[in-house]
Curated annotation (Swiss-Prot):
<dbReference type="GO" id="GO:0007218">
    <property type="term" value="P:neuropeptide signaling pathway"/>
</dbReference>
<dbReference type="Pfam" id="PF11109">
    <property type="entry name" value="RFamide_26RFa"/>
</dbReference>
<feature type="modified residue" description="Phenylalanine amide">
    <location>
        <position position="26"/>
    </location>
</feature>
<comment type="function">
    <text>May have orexigenic activity. May promote aldosterone secretion by the adrenal gland.</text>
</comment>
<dbReference type="GO" id="GO:0031854">
    <property type="term" value="F:orexigenic neuropeptide QRFP receptor binding"/>
</dbReference>
<dbReference type="GO" id="GO:0005576">
    <property type="term" value="C:extracellular region"/>
</dbReference>
<comment type="similarity">
    <text>Belongs to the RFamide neuropeptide family.</text>
</comment>
<keyword id="KW-0964">Secreted</keyword>
<dbReference type="GO" id="GO:0005184">
    <property type="term" value="F:neuropeptide hormone activity"/>
</dbReference>
<keyword id="KW-0027">Amidation</keyword>
<protein>
    <recommendedName>
        <fullName>Orexigenic neuropeptide 26RFa</fullName>
    </recommendedName>
</protein>
<keyword id="KW-0527">Neuropeptide</keyword>
<dbReference type="InterPro" id="IPR024565">
    <property type="entry name" value="P518"/>
</dbReference>
Length: 26
């Protein structure tokens, strides 16, 4: 589960960077 969560967080970070909008903080 921890690995999946990390992967999701990384994907979200990349998506936000692409959009250049807001940043996610966990």
């Amino acid at each position: 589960v921890g690995t999946a969560l990390g992967s999701l967080a990384e994907e979200l970070n990349g998506y936000n960077r692409k959009k250049g909008g807001f940043s996610f903080r966990f």
